[in-house]
Regions:
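Two-component histidine kinase catalytic core, primarily the HATPase_c
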Residues: 40
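Phosphopantetheine-dependent thiolation modules in NRPS/PKS and related acyl-activating systems
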Residues: 1-36, 44-46, 51-80
């Protein structure tokens, strides 16, 4: 399973099924398109840390705007 697929699963889990895979396009804005808020983002990051065995910089991740940026950022942590 790719990083993108795992991140999409995490987002769907956090949004409790209110989003579908069809909505999770790489260019999707996390806030306006996917309707995430800061609490959702925090939960996603905690689950990403557990799933990928990484430690993320919350401040850096708050600057991420799209799904593609989030996936790229997580990949950076995984290879660091």
């Amino acid at each position: 399973m790719t990083t993108n697929e795992k991140v999409c699963e995490i987002i769907i889990k956090v949004k409790k099924g209110k989003l579908t895979l069809d909505q999770l396009k790489p260019e999707a804005d996390l806030y306006s398109d996917l309707d995430l808020d800061s609490l959702d983002l925090s939960e996603i990051l905690v689950l990403a840390e557990e799933t990928f065995n990484i430690s993320v910089d919350i401040g850096k991740e708050q600057q991420v705007k799209t799904l593609a940026e989030m996936v790229a950022s997580i990949d950076e942590y995984r290879t660091a």
